[in-house]
Swiss-Prot record:
Official protein name in the record: Probable ABC transporter periplasmic-binding protein y4mI
Organism of origin: Sinorhizobium fredii (strain NBRC 101917 / NGR234)
GO cellular component: periplasmic space
Coiled coil: none
Keyword Transferase (UniProt): no
């Protein structure tokens, strides 16, 4: 009887230890919040896919918020996330200029934060990591490519459909492009900034640009929808191929346009990859592992003749989810 009692006690003790271990494991499980500026834009959905994918791989829980392109909503989201007990944040900010109060608050709460796609306002240092494209070098490379497209078509005047210039990534793109235009002998005759990042807006702006400057020979698209909108305008005007287009970011839509030679080049930005890498950096901060503060990912140029290569496919796997 005593042996049976001892056996039962051992079993009970084992069960209790297992339960305690389970509770301890649950308590150790971390949560990462993804704050998107807007989830109406595919790019930010894809960053979120990367955050969620990496969180699952690391054993973290995932929650997401959208800031609806409002700095006030962005701040509310950060406070809500902290109140709900998240351990870390990955953010695509509404703008770089909106980040100082956000960073001050998260520092006061000891919450690690990684930026994805858009970095903090220049001069800010109280962040864990910033995972962006190498926007300046990409701006130079894309500027040179666009200038070459213009010259191939008999001119040197180019137009630009730009991201909002209150974003540090857009400022770096523009600086690089302007340097390339000056070095290569092209003139940027007009730049129009997007507000909504929609194809319809890009169509309107491209139409306005070509009406004001019919001698434009190439268009620099700083974001994916700009390339789609510009291609639509050229098709409507019967100018496909006669005016060159290069675009940054990349999507199934612009890949199809590239294959159809409606655009001539895509500088791919790794949206999924930025989400993955940003999540890893905040996880490293939580676990006292080494952190890389500033990661500037290369944006490789892919042209129609290279789109089906193994190298291009490896890049595209970090741009948007496989289901797309």
């Amino acid at each position: 009887m005593r042996k049976k009692l001892n056996g039962w006690l051992a079993m009970a003790a084992g069960a209790a230890l297992a339960a305690l271990s389970s509770v301890s494991h649950a308590e150790d499980r971390k949560t990462v919040a993804y704050l998107a500026p807007s989830l109406d834009i595919s790019y930010w959905q894809w960053v979120g896919f990367g955050v969620k994918q990496k969180a699952q791989e690391l054993g973290m829980d995932y929650v997401e918020f959208t800031s609806e392109n409002s700095p006030a909503k962005q701040m509310d989201n950060a406070r809500t996330a902290v109140t709900k007990g998240v351990d870390a944040i990955v953010i695509g900010p509404v703008s770089s200029t909106s980040t100082p109060p956000l960073l001050a608050y998260l520092k006061s709460q000891n919450i690690p934060i990684a930026f994805a796609g858009i970095g903090p306002q220049p001069g800010q240092t109280d962040y864990t990591s910033s995972v962006t494209a190498n926007n300046y070098e990409t701006g130079k490379a894309q500027g040179s490519f666009v200038c070459a497209l213009a010259k191939e078509r008999g001119g040197n005047k180019v137009g630009m459909l730009s991201l909002p210039q209150d974003r540090e990534n857009a400022q770096k793109y523009l600086k690089g492009a302007q340097e390339a235009f000056a070095a290569d002998g092209c003139e940027l005759v007009q730049m129009l900034e997007t507000r909504g990042l929609t194809v319809n807006e890009a169509v309107t702006q491209a139409n306005d640009m070509l009406t004001a400057h019919p001698d434009i020979k190439a268009i620099y698209g700083m974001y994916d929808e700009a390339g789609t909108g510009a291609a639509k305008v050229l098709e409507t005007r019967g100018l496909t191929g006669k005016i060159g287009i290069a675009v940054a970011d990349g999507s199934p839509t612009t890949i199809a346009l590239l294959k159809a030679t409606a655009i001539q080049g895509i500088f791919f930005q790794e949206a999924v990859g930025q989400g993955i890498d940003g999540t890893l950096q905040v996880f490293n901060a939580l676990t006292n592992a080494p952190v890389e503060k500033d990661l500037a990912l290369v944006m490789p140029l892919v042209t129609a003749d290279k789109i089906d290569t193994a190298e291009a496919k490896a890049v595209i796997a970090r741009v948007f989810p496989p289901s797309n």
